[in-house]
Amino acid sequence: MDKNLVQSNSRFLCDDLPPVGPLALGLWRYTTPDIGHATNLLKTAIDLGMNLVDNADVYGLDWGGKGFGTCEELLGHVLSESPELRDQIVLATKGGIQPPVPYNSSSDYLRGACEDSLLRMNVEKIDLYQIHRPDM
């Protein structure tokens, strides 16, 4: 992949964050048990200019009730072993899907979901927190 393509048309999400390119690394299927492989995937994305990392608390859920939060936990292990990577990414995650409800975008639920995401990813802040499929 051409690094210039990934970095073209970068934009700022806010003044406190570095600009992000038009492509993000989506972690929906980021479930490998191999931390080295997971770390390499993140480093490769960064090397290609993809600094926006998109996660969600529900990523990893098998809809049989297992796996909720596993993609965030994996990223947490990667960032624990390679903490220098945290400063190289703009970290986005989502909350609001609450199996079996399925959606809960109440402020109480989202506050707790965000706090749980911080713990799972072993970070002090999330750069962009989004409501995942809001119930309107």
Enumerate the predicted regions with their spans:
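Glycine/proline-rich, positively charged
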Residues: 98-136
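Structural motif corresponding to the early beta-alpha repeats
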Residues: 58-59, 82-107, 132
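Conserved beta-strand positions
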Residues: 25, 55, 93, 128-131
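Active-site mouth loops of central-metabolism enzymes
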Residues: 26-37, 95-111
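Generic beta-strand or strand-like secondary-structure segments
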Residues: 74-78, 90, 94, 109-116
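N-terminal binding-site loop/beta-alpha segment at the start of enzyme catalytic domains
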Residues: 1-89
